[in-house]
Amino acid sequence: IMACGTGKTFTTLWVKERQFAKSTLVLLPSLSLLSQTLREWTFAANETFDVLCVCSDQTVGKQSNTDEIIHSVKDMSFPVTSEPQEISAFLKGDGNKVIFSTYQSSPLIAEAQIDTLVPDFDLVIADEAHRCTGTTGNAFTTILDQSLIRANKRLFTTATPRTYSANLKKKSSEMGVDVTGMDDEAIFGQVLYALPFGEAIKRGLLTDYQVVLVGVDNPMIADWIQRRQLIQTDENNAVD
């Protein structure tokens, strides 16, 4: 668990290298984040690795906090596949291999591993892992089932761990709905490391935020209207 901006992407790469993982799966919620993570891993890696990206136009996710928005796999700067047979062939090969995939395409990984000759992953990294919580039985929870995606180790990373109250879990159970939170150690394991926002500020890893309050009252607003005072917006639009 690491606050946004403290280096989760590089940390996961270094974990992979320290674990000497030769077969790695990295799951991400959008094409934009997948592209960004692949670029950063390639830039910072201490060893080379072969890459296969698994995604399709149906796996496009909404990602508002990125510098680029990728709406189609045609906009990707690297080859992609959505064929389980190609995934199987890649995983059967030798060398240091990394598959980058969207969560939405993770069932394709599971389909590829139906072939018993396809080895287990040494390591699976589930980024933005809070997306794996909630109701089970969807593409985002495929990674939680060892019988679907076989892996020796799983690492779940997030800045915002999501949990559910005992009352909500009870009500969901009464309705026949399974709800999983990140506090379920049987599924997500124990917290390996936590760097909350406040601690990151203390360490100088993040800049402290400032809250600015601007107080106005009705007479002040009426005066502005009377004088047709111009207001400059962040987009440099003048409004009167």
Residue ranges of model-derived segments:
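Conserved helicase motor
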Residues: C53-P84, T102-L108, R131-G134
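Walker A/P-loop
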Residues: I1-V15
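Conserved nucleotide-binding/hydrolysis micro-motifs of P-loop NTPases
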Residues: L31-L33, Q58-G61, Q104-P107, H130-R131, ...
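Interdomain helical connector at the RecA1-RecA2 junction of SF1/SF2 helicase-like NTPases
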Residues: A166-D240
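SF2 helicase catalytic motif II
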Residues: S105, I114-F156, T160-T163
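Substrate-gripping "pore-loop 1 plus following alpha2 helix"
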Residues: S77-S82, L117, R131-D145, L168-M182
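Conserved helix/coil segment N-terminal to the catalytic DExD/H
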Residues: P84-D120
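Conserved Walker A/P-loop ATP-binding site and its immediately adjacent core
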Residues: F20-N46, D50-Q63, Y103-S105
